[in-house]
């Protein structure tokens, strides 16, 4: 089985491509910082929607623990100010964000990842930046 790390994962198009061509693989981790995209990834590629129905069974009671975890991986990130938005999330969204990141094994901001803590992988893949946030090309 191919062990995959998916950087700049977006909604998981690289994962979808591997599935579509019949590759036997396991995603051992991802790197993504956009909050809403992460929840989409979790809804598509995990049992996020099912677990969300009983979310209190899967998240800590302590809000600060959830915030600390999200700040540590720098999720969600505000692209205009490059500030972490975890403290600004209202409780339902904070719980959703925490659960989604845990389920999909998100290591968060690629600039902050300690490579020594990454799981072993055979394939490192990535997606290109979303056009609405890329600084490349005509401005």
Question: What is the predicted role of each segment?
Answer:
Residues 1-139:
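Conserved active-site and SAM-binding loop architecture
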């Amino acid at each position: 089985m191919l062990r995959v790390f998916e950087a700049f994962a977006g909604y998981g198009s690289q994962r979808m491509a591997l599935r579509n061509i019949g590759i036997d693989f396991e995603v051992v981790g991802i790197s993504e910082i956009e909050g809403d995209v992460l929840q989409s990834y979790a809804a598509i590629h995990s049992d996020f929607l099912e677990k969300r129905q009983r979310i209190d069974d899967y998240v800590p009671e302590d809000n600060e623990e959830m915030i600390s975890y999200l700040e540590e991986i720098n999720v969600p990130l505000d692209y205009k100010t490059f500030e972490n938005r975890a403290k600004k999330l209202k409780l339902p969204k904070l719980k959703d964000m925490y659960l989604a990141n845990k389920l999909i094994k998100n290591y968060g901001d690629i600039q902050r990842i300690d490579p020594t803590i990454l799981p072993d992988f055979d394939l490192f893949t990535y997606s290109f930046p979303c056009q609405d946030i890329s600084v490349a090309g005509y401005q």
